[in-house]
Amino acid sequence: SIFGNIKRRVEEGRWEPNGGSWIEPDCNIPSGESLTRHFLYGQSFLKEELDYRADQFWMPDVFGYSASIPQILKLCGISGFLTTKLSWNEENRFPYDTFLWSGIDGTQVLTHFNTSHCWPDPETLVAQTMDIQHKDIQDTRLCSFGYGDGGGGPLTEMLEAAPYLK
């Protein structure tokens, strides 16, 4: 089964589960209780099925962020946050790639904002590397490739190109 193959890859250290929440939740309207339960159920599933506990929250495709997220993440044992949607602004460029996000109670969580999706070709990778805003603290960028909206994942061409880009 596909899930059986994933379990084997996790055991081999070749697949790192991420996220820690049950699904990628809406973060504009739900209460803190709702967000906390996403982590309770998500982390429980990862522990029961994969003997794994996520310490990074990967939330690439939401349209808003509750100011309580840093506090909720820390209380749920999550120490880092990765997102992409802050780049969907044509007027104001967000000034940071990597930063400490302070929640409404002052709790901070290390946050990385990946500014774009990636087609794994040399031109795109060079352009994205040149676009890193704070090279003194970050000199590489995650290349999250594939098509996420509506599913689909990476194209065959993307997977075939990846080994040549090391």
Positions of predicted regions on the chain:
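Catalytic-domain carbohydrate-binding cleft regions of carbohydrate-active enzymes
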Residues: 1-166
